């Protein structure tokens, strides 16, 4: 394997996605999990699934042996077309990791909760004892009822998981609101994405993507701002890189280098926190120089005149000292 002609792997642009392993026709390259088994892979079944790591929705084939995932390969789905990133291909071993909880544990009586206690994940039974599900649920419910009775329902709160489905999120908030009788329910998405959901709904009518990311392969210009697909959505980033290599104009707007700027024709490294100033300056130029489809704007938008008046003072000259561009 040659990485960037002669660069060592760690210094090259290799992202360890394992595509070379999946494509290798001679089995000269095989996953470590297979190599540890003398290069032989005898599986009980192959299960079709979807990678849980990010929102791209890559379809995968899980090769299962003795109820453990022995190997993962990309499936030709609409989002990934058989591609996977390093997490999707090599990061599924957590499923059978020995640090995972397989039975309920209850803290041993007399062992206090203090930051000084260092729980050994290889031997949690120093601080906890195994319990049945019935005992654990009864124990938890009793503690919840005690807190409710002594300090009120608002002393309780629930925090949902981004790994759950929409249906699971709905059931979770219903449990907190109707069972715990409190509105103290939250979720990481509320902090990260709620503002963008509201803004996207108001501006374009949809709070989700309106086209598959693979469509970037048919785009002339791609603008990436406020996103780090290289780390957060690596398979999506691979299609963006392909598009740029095939002639698409890639514009990356970000105060932090994330690797995608290496493929960009323009990289705007603005001052952190000055996104709005930069975008208003771009709006100013687009409107003042009439670089927009007037017929479309008149037919499909509202409030354009007010926007035009609002951004008149946000000229590039005025915004440049703020955003550093």
For each of these PLM feature ranges, what is it?
Residues 1-289:
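N-terminal export/assembly segments and adjacent metallocofactor-ligating motifs
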Residues 4, 126, 297, 309, ...:
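Short, flexible active-site loop motifs that bind/organize anionic cofactors or intermediates
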Residues 258, 293-294, 315:
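Residue-level signal for threonine
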Residues 282, 300-325:
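Active-site phosphate/pyrophosphate-binding segments
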Residues 290-304:
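Short helix-loop capping/hinge segments that flank enzyme active sites or metal/cofactor-binding pockets
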């Amino acid at each position: 394997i040659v990485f960037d002609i002669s660069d060592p792997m760690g210094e090259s642009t290799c992202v360890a996605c394992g595509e070379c392993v999946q494509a290798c026709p001679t089995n000269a390259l095989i996953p470590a999990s297979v190599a540890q088994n003398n290069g032989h892979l005898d599986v009980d079944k192959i299960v079709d699934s979807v990678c849980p790591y990010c929102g791209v929705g890559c379809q995968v084939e899980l090769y299962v042996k003795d109820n453990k995932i022995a190997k993962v390969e990309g499936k030709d789905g609409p989002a990934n077309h058989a591609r996977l990133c390093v997490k999707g291909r090599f990061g599924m071993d957590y499923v059978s990791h020995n640090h995972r909880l397989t039975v309920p544990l209850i803290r041993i009586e007399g062992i206090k909760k203090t930051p000084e206690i260092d729980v050994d994940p290889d031997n949690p039974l120093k601080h906890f004892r195994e319990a049945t599900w019935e005992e654990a649920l009864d124990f938890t419910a009793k503690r919840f009822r005690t807190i409710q009775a002594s300090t009120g329902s608002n002393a309780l709160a629930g925090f949902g998981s981004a790994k759950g489905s929409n249906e699971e999120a709905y059931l979770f908030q219903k449990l907190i609101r109707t069972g715990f009788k409190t509105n103290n329910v939250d979720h990481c998405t509320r902090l990260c994405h709620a503002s963008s959901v509201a803004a996207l709904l108001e501006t374009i009518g949809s709070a989700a993507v309106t086209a598959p990311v693979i469509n970037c392969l048919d785009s002339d210009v791609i603008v990436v701002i406020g996103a780090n697909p290289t780390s957060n959505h690596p398979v999506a980033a691979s299609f963006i890189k392909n598009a740029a290599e095939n002639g698409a104009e890639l514009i990356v707007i970000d105060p932090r280098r994330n690797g995608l700027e290496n493929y960009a024709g323009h990289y705007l490294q603005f001052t952190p926190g000055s996104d709005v100033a930069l975008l208003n300056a771009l709006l100013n130029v687009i409107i003042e120089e009439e670089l927009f489809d007037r017929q479309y704007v008149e037919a499909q938008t509202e409030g354009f005149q007010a926007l035009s008046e609002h951004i008149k003072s946000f000229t590039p000259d005025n915004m440049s000292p703020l955003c550093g561009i």
